[in-house]
C-alpha cells in the first residue's frame, strides 16, 4: 500500500500535453493521410482516440485509430497476472503507413516490444513511432519513445497510475510512493 500519492498531471495538464504531443506528431509526420494511431490496451486506446481528436481539431483531417492487445506477445507471461486478452482492432492495412503506437506509461519496455511484434502481423508500416504520456525510466530493452508527454524519474518500487475519462471517469496521473 502506498504511503503517499502525488498528483503528477491534472486534467488540464493532460489536455495541454495531448495538444503538444499532437502538434509534434503533425510536425514529424509529413503526409497525415498515411498516419495511423494504434493504442495499446488498456489506457493507450483512449489516449490514441484523444490524440486523434486533437490532430483532427488542429488539421481538419480524420486519423485512423486501432487498438492492439499484446497479451500473447509478451515475454514475461509467467510473471504477470492471468488476464483475458482484449480484442485487437486494426481494421486497416498498415503497409506503407506511419504508425504511432500510443501507451500511457513506458517502464521496462516489454509491452512496447510485444506491441512491435503484434503490429507487424497487420502489414509492413513504412515507420513505427512510439508516443507515451509518461516515461518513468528503468528500461530493460533499448526502446525509447519518439514523443513523451512527461519524463518522470521514479524508484522501481513506485507506481505511476494514469486515469482517463473514458475508462476511469477522470483525467489524472498520480505517483504512488
UniProtKB/Swiss-Prot annotation:
MF term (GO), any: uracil phosphoribosyltransferase activity
Q: Which reaction does it catalyse?
A: UMP + diphosphate = 5-phospho-alpha-D-ribose 1-diphosphate + uracil
Q: Which GO terms describe its biological process?
A: regulation of DNA-templated transcription
Check the record and name the Pfam families matching this protein: Pribosyltran (PF00156)
Q: SUPFAM superfamilies this protein is in? A: PRTase-like
Q: What is its EC number?
A: 2.4.2.9
Swiss-Prot/TrEMBL keywords: Glycosyltransferase, Transcription, Transcription regulation, Transferase
Q: Which family does it belong to?
A: Belongs to the purine/pyrimidine phosphoribosyltransferase family. PyrR subfamily.
Q: What does this protein do?
A: Regulates the transcription of the pyrimidine nucleotide (pyr) operon in response to exogenous pyrimidines.
Q: What is this protein called?
A: Bifunctional protein PyrR
Organism for this UniProt entry: Gloeothece citriformis (strain PCC 7424)
Amino acid at each position: 500500500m502506498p504511503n503517499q500519492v502525488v498528483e503528477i498531471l491534472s486534467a488540464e495538464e493532460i489536455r495541454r500535453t495531448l495538444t503538444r504531443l499532437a502538434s509534434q506528431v503533425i510536425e514529424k509526420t509529413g503526409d497525415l493521410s498515411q498516419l495511423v494511431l494504434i493504442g495499446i490496451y488498456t489506457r493507450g486506446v483512449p489516449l490514441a482516440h484523444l490524440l486523434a481528436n486533437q490532430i483532427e481539431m488542429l488539421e481538419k483531417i480524420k486519423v485512423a485509430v486501432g487498438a492492439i492487445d499484446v497479451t500473447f506477445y509478451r515475454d514475461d507471461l509467467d510473471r504477470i497476472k492471468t488476464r483475458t486478452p482484449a480484442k485487437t482492432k486494426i481494421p486497416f492495412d498498415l503497409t506503407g503507413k506511419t504508425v504511432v503506437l500510443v501507451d500511457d506509461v513506458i517502464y521496462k519496455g516489454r509491452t512496447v516490444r510485444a506491441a512491435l511484434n503484434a503490429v507487424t502481423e497487420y502489414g509492413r508500416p513504412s515507420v513505427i513511432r512510439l508516443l507515451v504520456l509518461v516515461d518513468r525510466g528503468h528500461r530493460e530493452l533499448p526502446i525509447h519513445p519518439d514523443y513523451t508527454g512527461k519524463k518522470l524519474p521514479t524508484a522501481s518500487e513506485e507506481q505511476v497510475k494514469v486515469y482517463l475519462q473514458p475508462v476511469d471517469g477522470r483525467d489524472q496521473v498520480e505517483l504512488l510512493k
